[in-house]
Amino acid sequence: MTDTTSTITSRRTPSTLAVWAIFAILFAAVQIASLFTPALLDDADASHAQAAQHMALTGDYVTLHVNGLRYLEKAPLPYWIEAVSYKIFGMTAFATHLGNSLALLGCTWLAWLWAGRAWGQRAGFYAGLGVLTAVGPFLYTRFAIPEALLSFFFLLALYCFLTGFESSRPLRFYGMWAALALAMLTKGLIAPVFFLAAALPLLILSGLWRRWRELKPFTGLLLFLLIAAPWHILAGLANPDQGNPVGNHPTIGHVHGFWYFYFINEHVLRFLGERFPHDYNKLPLSAFWLMHLVWLFPWSLFIPALIAAAWKSRKTWISQLRGNSGQTVDFYLDNAVRTDVASYIVGLKFRVRTTWLLSIFSVFTLCFFSLSTNQEYYTFPCWVPLLMLVAGIVASTEERRSFEGSEPRLSTRWLTYAQLVFAVVGVLVALALGWGLWSSRSLPYVSDIGTLLAHRGVGDYTLSMSHVFDLTGPSFAALRLPAILAAVALLIGPLAGWILRKMNRHLEATISVAITAAIFLIAAHIAFARFEPMLSSKPMADTLLSKAASSDQFIIYGDQADASSVVFYTDKLFHKPTLLVGERCSPYGVGSTMVWGSCWPDAPRVFISEQELVSEWGKGNRKWLFAQDANQQKAMQLLGSKLIAVQTIADKTLWTDRPLAQ
């Protein structure tokens, strides 16, 4: 299929200019407006930001460092992007998360382009709306993780792979190899593994494997290596094995270097659940799968229609995929009324191959992370393909076109029922929010929502959504504005959409889904920002910046991740690693991301014992001590009256060792 091949023209679909005007408004309202607040979050968000901060300040773009120690477990491209962003915009939350938002915009563009080419302009429009307004893509671009960038490169590689065969343009395949290399620099070995898991079955089932030379396997692989290999080689040379490491538990002076740690510990052993340290968790299988209804919401409501369409067309799955499909006498007779049967065949094949490729990629991604250790967002790369498939069936059903060129068409009742479910869900959620608002109506607004939350510790807080389960009735006192906004949107929007669907005004009904979701996401971001005292320690960093001297020492009782935002924001003041109360190179994995780096013989002094803390407290330069949750009691038992409280926020306290007047 050439670039000039006409695509299906969708009646009443907005023009390209109008579509991108809508996309721009949604992107600005949902993504850009949320880049400024909240501040960087403790744990992964600010820890990853520290690695990029070190790059920007030192110019070392090979070996990642966090709090002065080697941090070898991640691929570098996201940190390179953040470091460049820091150079341009300064070291802020905006600069940290801008790359994620731009990657999501790139996914929107590719979804619009690809779905529009496969199923028509309306499908492209809906695919873009889905990417910009689904819950999962919004939620997991709020902090510094590489999944949005990885999804963009995956989508680009798959699109270049498929269109390369359609257009017979070598540049498309070179684009595929380049995108794969960048994906590997984003997330590691899963890039080629996931791509091959989708591409190889399609090549075999469709017969395209006979055209394997067009893939440019030799020169393309060379391009892949030219892009991906240099950093891996340099990182390995800069971080070789130290001493005589044995097994997977390092000891001081005896630690595996980059090659083992990155490829074996972080890839193979993480998949098997044997990685050290064991600072991660795994969702129950049923929850892992069912939560995708949330990540793709509200567009997941149309998944039953997608499944129904796939079942109705099951008899043509393979026949339309093979190289000679559409070339029989019966096929030409059935389509004799078409003005250009050849173009129809080409378009049909592209649509069928798109469906297969996106489906295989999505299923493999879901199954892979069902077996391995996982976080909720690990399947992010398959969310955009699933949204594209949903957009294709919704648009085809609205326009009363047969799916994959076969009969029968899917009834629009499937869409009406989905809209009805959305309306029911909207009413129920609005009622729940209303109850929360009513029950907290007499409570005063409390800026520190952390004092109103229950600390239930779901998943021991190793899952990204653990804090959601800490919500209590009184916490609605701090969430009145976002709760009201979400309740109104969910009460009115879905009902209006259902009425429009009943009136056969399908385009307007589907747009109403996106508008409702966008307003809900804006409300969700306002609520998320209200959680800042609980999730970020930036106010304590501000206190240090205003009261501490550069000669002072900041100490964390516990893991660096507990106050990683303080470490990030105060780096410009202290210019030295934060001390951690704990065991260096702990055999039990205490210290999490700091463990491996602290085992290196040239590692700076970062860990101190409790005895050292007691002996040094109150002596020399001023000390500042941070402790969170259970560590607060430990610190108070250890130092007692020697602690001078400076600030308490949520479950975090900042102390110093002498009165501030001194």
Identify what each model region corresponds to.
Residues 2-7, 16, 174, 309-324, ...:
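Membrane-embedded architecture of ER/inner-membrane glycosylation machinery
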Residues 2-407, 440, 572:
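Membrane-integral, polyisoprenol-dependent glycosyltransferases
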